[in-house]
Design a protein with these regions (language model features):
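N-terminal beta1-alpha1-beta2 submodule of the flavodoxin-like/Rossmannoid cofactor-binding fold
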Residues: 1-90, 95-113, 173-201
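Short, glycine-/small-residue-rich phosphate/pyrophosphate-handling segment
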Residues: 100, 116-163
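Residue-level signal for alpha-helical context at structural boundaries
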Residues: 21, 34, 41, 119-123, ...
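Beta-strand-loop-alpha "switch" segments that mediate conformational coupling across diverse proteins
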Residues: 163-170
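Intrinsic disorder/low-structure terminal segments
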Residues: 80, 86-87, 153, 157, ...
Length: 201
């Protein structure tokens, strides 16, 4: 897979969905292929903190999680092991990621524990993950900090280093993003530049 873009909004057709489309346009304009995965379209159960992943040292991949074969969380995780470029887009809900997105992030706990037994994916080459965050609030000193911190350590599960996020304030109702030509241009440029850098390696 060339590039995978995860869109984390619960709302279909909102601004972070639009950001995902713009990133894809940027990647394609640079000669890459991009797939957008909408997290809301997948069934993801909550981590139960059952401890199964701590003791199931003879299991790998999705079998390391007690819920791994009962929902679609692993289906979303898989591209993160192979994609050459990774992007996340998300709105901000109460200074953090939306609940469905955060539920998926929480389900990656088994990957942290799997590192202790050196599953094959742990030696993946380091890659970069890029993020676009949009918030309805026009102000807030730490408006993006919760989402950024969670994504930083989530990405590390897959040997992905989170680049400085592209963030936008005062983007709330559908169409707000497109109302700012400079915003849409910056997102498209991010997609194009990110893929161009990957393609040169």
């Amino acid at each position: 897979m060339d590039a995978v873009i995860y869109a984390g909004s619960h709302r279909r057709g909102g601004n972070s969905d639009r950001a995902a489309e713009l990133l894809a346009e940027g990647v394609r304009s640079a000669g890459g292929q991009a797939d957008i995965l909408f997290i809301r379209d997948y069934e993801i159960r909550h981590c139960k903190a059952c401890g199964f992943c701590d003791t199931a040292t003879d299991c790998q991949g999705q079998k390391r999680c007690a819920l791994g074969q009962k929902d679609q969380a692993w289906e979303l995780f898989e591209p993160l092991f192979t994609a050459r470029a990774v992007f996340f887009t998300s709105p901000i809900y109460f200074y953090h990621l939306p609940s469905m997105f955060k539920t998926w992030v929480d389900r990656s706990q088994f990957l942290w524990t799997a590192r202790r037994t050196n599953e094959p994916w742990t030696d993946l080459p380091e890659r970069t993950a890029h993020t676009v965050l949009v918030a309805g609030r026009p102000r807030g000193e730490k408006l993006f900090e919760g989402a950024r911190t969670s994504l930083k350590y989530f990405a590390a599960n897959f040997n992905l280093k989170l680049a400085e996020p592209l963030v936008f304030r005062g983007v709330d109702t559908p169409g707000d993003l497109d109302a700012h030509a400079d915003f849409t241009t910056r997102i498209t440029v991010l997609g194009r530049q990110a893929w161009s850098e990957v393609a040169q390696r």
